[in-house]
Amino acid sequence: MACVTFREPISATVGKRMVFTGPAYVKDHLPQVAQHTAYIGEKRPALEKTGDLRYLWRPASNRSLPAKYKPEYVGEIGWGIPEYDFINKTRLQTGFHIKYEEFSQAAIDKLSHRYQSPWQPNPSIMDAEGSSSRGFIAWHMGDYEDTSQRNSKRAVLLRQSKAALPIGSRPPKLPKLPKKEEKSKFRPLHQHDARCY
């Protein structure tokens, strides 16, 4: 019969539940307060400055537990595992896990505009179509090509803008200003200069 031996665990944390863990779950995490953190120098520092760094290494108040378990936070370890779906159900239904910030929206725009032409029709056509015509995504040039063969609303607008306007509806031409006559370099003798008197 084989002999079963029992040995003490290598670490004191083996086989026990860890509440506060350090990096990589190596051991229980306990805050360490550094000694002698006050400022020592030649002159006394200004009153609004502080050299006391004890507040940086202060432990958590009453050693309180974290508010939620890690799998409850979106994107944390264990999040989205089917066994823990009951935790994340409301967040999945509301789309909370998908966040479009400034840079991700810019990346989406760059990808969606890659195979689109940035061509846009004349501003007069865009004005005729209304405020929604100046949209976010570029226009499709195919809607405006071969306008004689298409009957879409946009093609009709383009044809109308290209057609010559009748004389009565054209804006009137402004009269040209008369050219200024060149002044002679010499003044007549009978005119008196007011600066002399």
Swiss-Prot record:
Comp. bias regions, Basic and acidic residues: 178-197
Question: Which range is the signal sequence, renumbered to this chain?
Answer: none
Ranges where the record places region Disordered: 161-197
Any Pfam family the entry gives: DUF4562
InterPro entries xref list:
DUF4562
From what superkingdom does this record's organism come?
Eukaryota
Q: What is this protein called?
A: Protein SPMIP2
Q: Which organism is it from?
A: Bos taurus
